[in-house]
Amino acid sequence: MENDKGQLVELYIPRKCSATNRIIKADDHASVQINIAKVDEEGRAIPGEYITYALSGNVRARGESDDSLNRLAQNDGLLKNVWSYSR
C-alpha cells in the first residue's frame, strides 16, 4: 500500500525463495537474504550494485543452502566450475 506521497507503507513485503521460488512466510525466522556485491576490475565493490538472494528456512534446514547458492551464482555468471554433489 502507498500513502499520498507514493511511498511504501507496508510493514511486510513478501519475498520469494531464490532456490525454490516459493513465497517466504512472515513467520519464517530461519530465512536469510544475502547480498553479493558486484566488483570492478580491481576487485573493489561497486557502490549500490549487488545481486540479492533470499533463502527460505526450509532450504536451510535441509542443508541445501550452500549448493543452492552455488547454483544460483553460476546461473548469474558469478562462479565458474564449482563442483556439485548433485551432478
From Swiss-Prot:
Q: Which family does it belong to?
A: Belongs to the eukaryotic ribosomal protein eS21 family.
Keywords assigned: Cytoplasm, Ribonucleoprotein, Ribosomal protein, rRNA processing
Q: Which InterPro entries match?
A: Ribosomal_eS21, Ribosomal_eS21_CS, Ribosomal_eS21_sf
How does this polypeptide assemble, per the annotation? Component of the small ribosomal subunit. Mature ribosomes consist of a small (40S) and a large (60S) subunit. The 40S subunit contains about 33 different proteins and 1 molecule of RNA (18S). The 60S subunit contains about 49 different proteins and 3 molecules of RNA (25S, 5.8S and 5S).
The answer to whether UniProt assigns keyword Ribosomal protein to this entry is yes
What's this chain's function?
Required for the processing of the 20S rRNA-precursor to mature 18S rRNA in a late step of the maturation of 40S ribosomal subunits. Has a physiological role leading to 18S rRNA stability.
One biological-process term from Gene Ontology?
Answer: translation
Q: Where in the cell is it found?
A: Cytoplasm
Recorded GO molecular functions are:
structural constituent of ribosome
Q: Which gene encodes it?
A: RPS21
GO CC annotations?
cytoplasm; ribonucleoprotein complex; ribosome
Tell me which domain of life the UniProt entry assigns to the organism this sequence originates from: Eukaryota
Protein name (record): Small ribosomal subunit protein eS21
* Pfam families for the chain: Ribosomal_S21e (PF01249)
Q: Does the keyword rRNA-binding apply?
A: no
Q: What is its main location?
A: cytoplasm
